[in-house]
Each structure stands twice: as C-alpha cells, then as structure tokens.
Amino acid sequence: MLKRFFKESLIYGLSTYIQKFIGVFLLPLYTALLTPEDYGILDLLGTVAIISIYLVVSGTDSSLSYYFFRKEHTEERPVMVSSTLIIRLTFASAAFIIVGLLSHKLTFLIFGKDYSLFLILTGISLAVQSIYSFFTDLIRFEKRPWVFTFVSVSNLLVNIGLNIYFILILKKGVWGAIMASVISYGLMAGFTIFYVFKRYGFHFSASWAKKILVYGSPLIGTAFAVWILTTTDRYFLAHYRNIADIGIYAVGFKLASFLGLVSGALQMAWSPYAMDIQYESNAKKIYAKVFFIYFVVNILAVFIISMFSIDILKVFTQPAYYSAKAVVPFLCMSVVFFSGYFIVSIGIAITKKAQHTIWITLTAAAVNIVMNFLLTPTIGAVGAALSIMTANFLIFMLTLSVSQKLYPVDYGYFKIAALFLPAAVIVTVSYYFDLKLTIKIILGVVYFISAGTYLYLNLKNSDEMKMILKKIKSMGSKNKAAEAAFVPDDLPENPA
C-alpha cells in the first residue's frame, strides 16, 4: 500500500516538477518585461481570484473526497460526481457575475486606480480554474495519476506558449499574463465538462447536492480564514509600503513554491490514499511513516533553497528583485507547515470533525493579522514573511493537537527536530555573514553527509532499510556471479 502511495506521489511529482519548471521558465520573462509594480498587480489580482475560487468550491472538493471512497456509496458515484460538478458550474457562474459587477469599486479599493478590465478577466479565469480543479480532484480520486500528468502538462504547455506570445511578442504585460491564464484554463474547463458528463452521465440529485453542501459548508469559513491567512500580507504591504514591494515579495514566494515539487506531489496523492487505507490494520503506522518522510525531504529541500536563494535569484531574475532573498527561508518554512497540516489532519478527516478546522484557521488568521500590523510597517516584506510563517506553524500545531486527540498516531518528533535545528543554524549563519558560494557549498555538503549518516543510524533497523540493504547485497551477489561466468576455465597459469 505504501509503495503505491509513493509511486503515485512520484507521478504527481513529475507533473508538479514540470509546473515548477515552467514557473521558473516564466520567471525571467516576467521579471525582465514586467516591473516589480506590474508583478505586484498580478499578485494582488491573484488574491482576489483565490478567495473567489474558495467560495466557488465551497468545500465540495472535500465532500466529494469523503463520499467517493465510502464503500456504501460506490454504486451512486455517477450521480454524486455529476451533481457536484453542476454545483461547481453554478457557483462559478455566480462568482464571475459578482466580480464583474463589483470590478470598478474593487479595483479602486485595492489599487486606488481603475483596473476593472483586469479584474473582469481575472473573474473569468477564476471561474474556469475552479471547474478545471474539479477535474484534477476527480482524476486523483480515480487514482489515474498518468492522466492527471498528461492533462496538467498539456495545460501548462499551452499556458507558457500563450504567455510568450502575449508578453514577449505582443508586449501586453499584465493583460497578456491574465489572458494566457483565461484561454489555457478555459480549454481545460471545457474538457472537464465533456469528460465528466461523458464518463458519469448528466445527472442531478437534490439529495446528493444537499449532502455535498452540508459536508462542505463548514469548510467555507475555513476557506475564508485561509484566504485571510495567505493574502493579508499583500494588503499590509500595499498599505504600508507599495505595490512594487508586493512584486518583490511575490518573487520570494515563487522561489518558496518550488517546495511544491515535494509538498504538492505528496499532498495530491495523500488525500485519496489516506482515506482509502483508513480501514487497514497498519494504517496508523503508514501515516507515521509518511509524516516522517514528508518532513525529512522538505527540511533538506528548504535547506538547499534557503542557502542558495541569492544565487538562484541572480540566475532567474533581474537586480530589482534580488532583495527577495530576505524572505525566502521564512516563506519556505511557511509552505512546509501549511502543506504538513494536510498530513496531520487525517484524524479530523476520518472522524468527520471538520468544524475544528474553522476555529483553528480563524485563530491562525487572527495571529497573522496582528503580527502583520506590528511587523510590516517597520520591517516590510520580512515582517510579512515572519507573520505568515508563524501563522502556518500555529495552524499546523493546533491541527496536530486536535487530530491526535481524535485519532492518535505515534509520530517521531525528535528525529525531525534533530535534522531541522542544524539546518536552521547553518542557514542563519550563511545569511548573517553573507557567505561566498564556495563556503556555502562546503557547508551544504557537510550537512548532507551528517544528515545522511544520522538517518542511516536511526533507520538501519527499519523494515524499509533492511529491504534496501538486502537488495543491494543481492545486486552485489549477482554481479559477482556474472563476473565469474565470464572467467575462462583454461586461463594459463601465472608464469611467476
């Protein structure tokens, strides 16, 4: 079972890797042709799209995930899936109309200027993205990762081609970036509708619609709190600093989002996998292993990105964006804590106690607002990054605490801390003394050797490590046998 999970994670990771690669590919394009202010406008428009998508989804993704894997509802999947898509289509249409009607007032409120056309296009983009996200969720539930990868890659290739055309060739700037998203996701939304109704039929059940909405409705408050949690920093920066600072901050976030290669892949495979194995006798043991592997891999990834952030920025951006280096470590850890929350919330999901996510997220959002109010006016983007990292750490810890009470799992906290603390010290020293690249490479090699040794000593008696060592020994034996097979029997004797 665990092998299947990591196989699916690897496939999802391939798709995520390509997404991140394309993100890297577009970053030089954006930073070369868009000013930090333009990039800031795009980022703020993105925050409007995020809350709109959350409201459109309205927890229906979690609802479908829950009912899709209930054994007693297997035969009802067609009407369940079709009804959920119809709900999504209805909410997406309503969201677009509302954003369109309020576009003029909203843009003046956010930017102090009339960017209503940009916001209307963003409204179209959010509508089609929310429909496309239904497809990606469904494909994961169906455990068809290769289909997910194919469709995702197709979408991304179209997106990157349109970005190059609109921004590089036509010089359309912000408008071009949004239009590329509208067209690429619009095509995928059309495919989603065709796929679902072709595969599951066109059905609508009021009773299933009610079940889906009742299960997901508590998550609307959570979604709103998550939006506050993840976007407050931009609005504080816009108020106390300027739009250009948001652009620089957004580039730092883009760098931190490379962690999505690991976090996103595990997260996409995790929800259907975790719910599917809940009835297995060794489910808790598997949950603990996934938790440990998730944090080990992410700590190592955060170490690399944080240590070499300025070097990465010099390769992929322009000098105007180099100051994003200061926020990268905090934003990286923020991503790790936020994605880790999905891993440790398994107890809440299994026991159907989703209401806990509301107060947990609201608490974290409140802390984020207070910290932004205190820190952003004085230390700018660094204060915003510290605020979101602290808030996501809080949401992770509170979720872990509640989930453990509902469904205890024996996680190995000390082993994680032993890896994290040395990494944090090395990165801090590197930033404080602004170390040269060669010294950072040496420190990185030393840390990885130490971490590898530590992991080996702690895991050498585990079943997985024994299996790996057994395979290595087996390969060695086969190689020796192969070598012996090629030694002739009639070799001449040694003349000596």
Language-model-derived ranges and their functions:
Residues 64, 136-137, 141, 145, ...:
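C-terminal transmembrane helix end/exit motif
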Residues 103-122, 305-336:
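Interfacial segments at transmembrane-helix termini and the short loops linking adjacent helices
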